[in-house]
Every structure is written in C-alpha cells, then in structure tokens.
Regions:
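Short, Lys/Arg-rich, polar N-terminal cytosolic tail immediately upstream
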Residues: 1-26
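Hydrophobic alpha-helical transmembrane segments of integral membrane proteins
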Residues: 111-139, 201, 205
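Membrane-interface micro-motifs in multi-pass membrane enzymes
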Residues: 141-162, 196
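N-terminal TM1-TM2 helical hairpin plus the immediately adjacent luminal interfacial "cap"
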Residues: 47-109
Length: 229
C-alpha cells in the first residue's frame, strides 16, 4: 500500500513539545498559582531586607482593618493578601502553592481564583464588619486598627471548597476535622484572624454548592485518566 500523500510529523517533533522540564510544564498549566507565588516570594524577600520598624509599618499600612475601611483605603483588602504573616514565609508560600495549585489544576484558573478571592474578601468584610459593630456598640476588646494581613482567609476558603467537592471520605471527615481544628484554635486564642478562618471555611463550603463549581467537578470526574495527561 502506497504511503504517498500522507503527512508524517518529523521525528522528535512530539518529543520536542514535551522536552521542557516537568516543573516548567506544571508552571505553564498553573499560571495563576505561579504568578501569585512569585508575588508572595518577591514581597517576602523585600520585607526580609527591611528593618523591623519598616516591616511593622508596611504591615500596619496594608492591614485591612476598620480604620482603613473608614478612611477609604479599600485597596488594603487586596494588598493584605500579598503578605505572609503569622507563619514562616516559606511555609505560607508552600501552602499556597499546594492548595491554590490543586484548585487550579482541578477547576482552572478562573474558578480557583474566584474561590480564593471569595474566601479572602468575604471573610475580611464579615470579620471587619463584626468589629465595626462591636466598636459602634462600645463592646470591650474591639480594635479599629487591628493587624489583619495574610493569605490565610483565601487559603482556608479554597481548602474548604476542595474538601467539600472531594471524595466522600474527605467531605465526611476532612471538612469537619478542619472545622474542629479551627474552632479549637479560636476558642484558645480568641483572635480576630481565628474567627476569620472559620468564616472563610464556611464561605469555601458555600462556594462548593454553586453549580459553577459542582458542574466543573462532575465534568472533571467523568474525564478518563488518560485524557487528562
């Protein structure tokens, strides 16, 4: 049988398409996560080179607290998410790479980014709104200039959504276990951020009930393993 008229790809063309380092292929697929991790790393490296006073000023000026909301500095709700606080920078950045990366791998950048931002902004607005009510009612312990920066609200919200859309064992045991751990931490420390983590977890579980995410999760589950490689 003649093979004239058929087109054969040059040997090595397909191999060349996949010749990149595996890390580069992953970064290309997880562009949102890669960009965010690079931003967090750049901010952490810059802060590491500053004095203690300069770092404290940066955190203070980028905290999304009641005072900044009242004076119109709403942009702090976004810039606060560029600072890793409360844990070593490498640990926070690694957690973002894993959790946001897994979400982007499963749902795509639009859905993963939307869930992360929903958890971050939603928990920030609700906790600061509660703080504003406490200040208005003159309840002791309320602070208008509270230190509130970090990636944790978006991180917890995304993790909660992943657990809620995961296999049955994760939904039944993983999500309640995370909620219990966060509740115990809040009961022991009584910090604003601890309450925000519980709120973010609830928001993540709520986001998992939307058709936009549930439909994507079902479609992903129906795709054969060979088709996702």
């Amino acid at each position: 049988m003649s093979e004239r008229g058929t087109t054969t790809a040059p040997a090595g063309l397909d191999a060349g398409a996949d010749a990149r380092h595996p890390a580069l292929r992953v970064a290309d697929r997880l562009r949102l996560t890669t960009v965010y991790v690079l931003l967090l790393t750049a901010t952490a490296c810059w802060l590491a080179g500053q004095s203690h006073g300069a770092r404290a000023r940066f955190v203070r000026h980028n905290s999304s607290n009641v005072h900044h909301m009242e004076v119109g500095k709403w942009w702090t709700m976004f810039t606060s998410g560029l600072v890793v606080d409360g844990v070593p920078a490498w640990a926070g950045i690694a957690a973002v790479a894993v959790v946001l990366g897994l979400a982007e791998w499963r749902w795509g950048p639009a859905r993963a980014g939307a869930v992360f931002v929903f958890g971050h902004l939603g928990a920030t607005l609700l906790t600061e709104g509660a703080m504003w009510v406490m200040l208005t009612a003159r309840i002791p312990g309320a602070l208008s200039r509270a230190r509130d920066v970090g990636i944790s609200y978006g991180l917890v919200g995304t993790a909660g959504c992943l657990l809620a859309l995961g296999p049955a064992p994760l939904r039944r045991f993983g999500l309640p276990a995370l909620g219990l751990g966060l509740a115990v931490t809040w009961a022991l420390d009584q910090q604003l951020a601890d309450a925000g983590h519980l709120v973010a977890l609830g928001l993540g579980a709520l986001a998992a009930r939307t058709p936009w995410l549930r439909g994507r999760a079902r479609a992903r589950a129906r795709v054969p393993v060979s088709a996702t490689r």
